[in-house]
């Protein structure tokens, strides 16, 4: 009996406060984010174009439909979360893609988060103005 290929591949991406759940299915390259088309959802955000870098690096652009749900954060963080989610999902399609994506940093989770505000300060590090007299 032949091994069945799964018809859906899943990857999770996170960046700042944004979390993206990416589902890849074989198709003609249609990308839907939260029920809207990719271009409509990001409306010309230049950083959003980089979210699809994983498809370009692996030569799989146009071979998969992506259904993405993304929550939290702003447009930039969401775009980066989608980029990581797509890269992780593509790894499940073919583990050999790691050699193409790893040098480009597509599989690296950016650990930078917002630093918390401390009491006695105006922001995380900004102290109140100092007066000598």
From Swiss-Prot:
What are the record keywords, sorted? Ribonucleoprotein, Ribosomal protein
Gene Ontology terms: cellular component: cytosolic small ribosomal subunit
The cross-references to Pfam families, in alphabetical order and at most eight, read:
Ribosomal_S9 (PF00380)
**Bias kind Basic residues: ranges:** 119-133
Bias-annotated ranges (Basic and acidic residues): 107-118
Xref: Gene3D superfamilies = 3.30.230.10
Q: Which InterPro entries does the UniProt entry name for this protein?
A: Ribosomal_Su5_D2-typ_SF (IPR020568), Ribosomal_uS9 (IPR000754), Ribosomal_uS9_bac/plastid (IPR023035), Ribosomal_uS9_CS (IPR020574), Ribsml_uS5_D2-typ_fold_subgr (IPR014721)
For region Disordered, the annotated ranges are 101-133
Q: Which GO terms describe its biological process?
A: translation
Q: Which GO terms describe its molecular function?
A: RNA binding; structural constituent of ribosome
Q: Which PROSITE patterns match?
A: RIBOSOMAL_S9
HAMAP family on file: Ribosomal_uS9_B
Family according to the record: Belongs to the universal ribosomal protein uS9 family.
Protein name listed in UniProt? Small ribosomal subunit protein uS9
The primary gene name is rpsI
């Amino acid at each position: 009996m032949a091994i069945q290929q799964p018809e859906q591949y899943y990857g999770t991406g996170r960046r700042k406060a944004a979390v993206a759940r990416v589902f890849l299915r074989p198709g003609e390259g249609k990308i839907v984010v939260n029920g809207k088309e990719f271009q409509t959802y990001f409306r010309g955000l230049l950083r959003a174009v980089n979210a699809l870098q994983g498809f370009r690096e692996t030569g799989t652009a146009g071979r998969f439909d992506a259904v993405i749900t993304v929550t939290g954060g702003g447009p930039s963080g969401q775009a980066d979360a989608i980029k990581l989610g797509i890269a992780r999902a593509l790894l499940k399609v073919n583990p050999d893609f790691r050699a193409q994506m790893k040098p480009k940093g597509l599989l690296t989770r950016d650990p930078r988060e917002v630093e918390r505000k401390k009491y006695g300060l105006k922001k995380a590090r900004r102290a109140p103005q100092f007066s000598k007299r």
